[in-house]
Every structure is written in C-alpha cells, then in structure tokens.
Amino acid sequence: MGDDGVGIKIGRELKRQGYKVEELGTDIFSLMRVYNGENKVIIVDAVLGEIPGKVVYFKGEDIFKKLRAEIRSAHFMGAVEGLKLLLEVDERLKNAELHFVGVTIKEPKLGLELSEEVKRAIPRAMELILSIIREGE
C-alpha cells in the first residue's frame, strides 16, 4: 500500500480516535450495506494529480462536477458515476451531506510506505475532516 493507501491510513486514524469509519475499498456500492442514516458521509481517498500531497475537498454536487473534470480517483474506476447512481437507488442517502476529501498522488505505486509529500498532507486532511464532522454539531 503505497501513496494510494492514504485514504485507508486516514480512515484508520479516525477510527482509532473513535469515529465511525467504513473501509469500502473499490466497491462504492458497499456503502448501501453500512449506511445507517448518518447526517454526513465523508469519502476519503487518494486522487491522481500533478502535485502529490495536495488536499482537495468537494461537497455535494461539486463532487460530481469538479472531481470528474479536474481529478480522477486513484481507486474508483467510475466512482463518481457509481456514487451518483447510488444516490438515485438509495433514498436514504439523498438527505445526507456528502463530502469528498482527497490527497493527491502522482501515480499509484506498489510499496508499503507513503511518500513524504503524502505523509505531510495527512494532518491537513485530518484537520479538514474533523472540521467537517464538527460543523453543525
């Protein structure tokens, strides 16, 4: 798990801190099994970009517009389309605030360690995610 595992690393740290986290892997549709009506759904993943270690954030419809146009996910082939379809078939998700937090990576590589650029992005991504969670509490 090289840089493309940054979402898993962040998720596991959030889980360690007591937050509800589900690892979906490459199957966005497994969200249907684990979603229980939470007000907010935050998807965290590595995204391909030119500059590794940049934290990107999209909310609501911007996820579909900007993510497709600007950055493609390192894991989910067609994740944007899959998520849009999921919102159509699962009525429960229509009321949830949807958020996407990504950390850019240059390219997925085999390996066990994160690059320094991506490691340095984790605290910024965590801070952003925690602010999303706290917003409106």
Swiss-Prot record:
Protein's recorded name: Protein FrxA
Lineage top rank: taxon: Archaea
Organism the protein comes from: Pyrococcus furiosus (strain ATCC 43587 / DSM 3638 / JCM 8422 / Vc1)
InterPro entries linked: Pept_HybD-like_dom_sf (IPR023430), Peptidase_A31 (IPR000671)
Biological process, per Gene Ontology: protein processing
GO MF term (any one): endopeptidase activity
Leader peptide range in chain numbering: none
